[in-house]
Amino acid sequence: MALNNNRFVVLSFRLILSFFFLLSAYGKLVDIERYSVDAVYNFGILPMVLARPFGLVMPFIELFCGMGMLFGVFTRLSALGIGLMSLSFFIAKAIVLSQGRTIDCGCFGAVIDTLASVTIFFDLPIMFIAMTVMWAPSEVRYWKTLGNLLPSKWKERLRLIW
């Protein structure tokens, strides 16, 4: 049986992703300038004109994706967002490490100090977990969710982005 056809596996994956991304968003939103904007600057990959807006928006995207996974609403969109963020985090950390620099990646903001050399090993498994949730059939992906409480006509309209 494929992992993405097992309701318990997909629910577990959703809760794991939710935990990590809600924790990450919280840690950055405590002091967004210090823990998100400065972390993006420290990577030195984005141009200065893009680093600040990216640092300001990223915690809110993490919050949206984490809430989507927790409540089972927009899970496909949330999983896609988590997968793309994990891929971009992996690439950014790989670039920094290839330059021989050691930085705090800012992954969990004020909650935990994290080095890019350590957290890079979590990015690809998180991406795999997110893609497993994204490709799960909707009856598996939405098992035990708030999405089941919506009227059926809304479910049909939202099925494409869910």
Which residues are covered by each model-predicted region?
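Solvent-exposed, well-ordered loop and adjacent helix/strand elements within mature globular domains
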Residues: 20-58
